[in-house]
């Protein structure tokens, strides 16, 4: 005997209200892989955390290297986050890293290998993100999300290097990045439950 739920759906607000943490800065997520994958992921994450929030003020701070150079530090630390807050007049900062490992190119035997060839590849990826309060330098929230997906437009170079440099990142990496971002940003978004 099957039971069918007929209860109505009720909206549950985000677990974290970002208006309580404004003004917010976001440092472009670090990524070991060269190319557009990490900046694309940062942009998608920013869009996702804003989606179900009221108007929130977010400042794009640039890359970690640029931010550290501006504040005179060599790594992100408690003191560095406090300096970021003072320099940019921010209450909280998002920082993260996109780790891509085990790139498995899909190369057919009919292709002749040449340096600079673009192929699709299956990759394992993990997105790690934290939100840090600048006054104390303490982490308020953190998460990680992992996925394995096939992506396109991976350039291969002599010596085994890979570059994620698609002209259209949404088409090439969208499935992977959307999964990682949706999973990592869930605490900032509306959810639904049945009553």
Regions found by a protein language model. Name each.
Residues 6-20, 87-88, 100-103, 119-195:
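C-terminal/domain-edge helix-coil "capping" segments
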